[in-house]
């Protein structure tokens, strides 16, 4: 599909690999977040550093940090790594939401291209013929919470002067909630995907409809 219209035939495996590529980028983002936060602020004290002759590099090595912070005032007030993490969480949820939307669309009664196990669905309260894709819809909905967490952090930080301000205690609850929701969705999605079945006959019929091979014919 392109712009929700039949476009060109591809294998289902090719489509699944497109989902894989999105998640690979998410993994790369998380790895970069790990690099960015692997800086030891110890020794910055309240804001102006410590007068004691500590060996910060030795302490960093002992604690497993890759490097030390360069400026004590920045180290005390820096929450870039929290925002980076929240952004990575948001992108994971955006990708899971897009996957969910495609599943919901394909399960549409007018298309019925795929189906998932009933464990991830519910029936209707008054329409017994319906099979509602609850888990994909809930994952799609949770995406808004992750984006909201990122927005909350950015708004929290935008007006803060250097160095530490008590406002910063709010970042813990925000990022912990975001992480919790992302982990729950990442736990559910693969369990859902392994139950996915494709109606091969219908997929083959779609591949022949609406001149979807027109581009290949023109190229030929």
Where are the predicted features?
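Conserved small/polar residues in nucleotide/adenosyl-binding loops
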Residues: 1
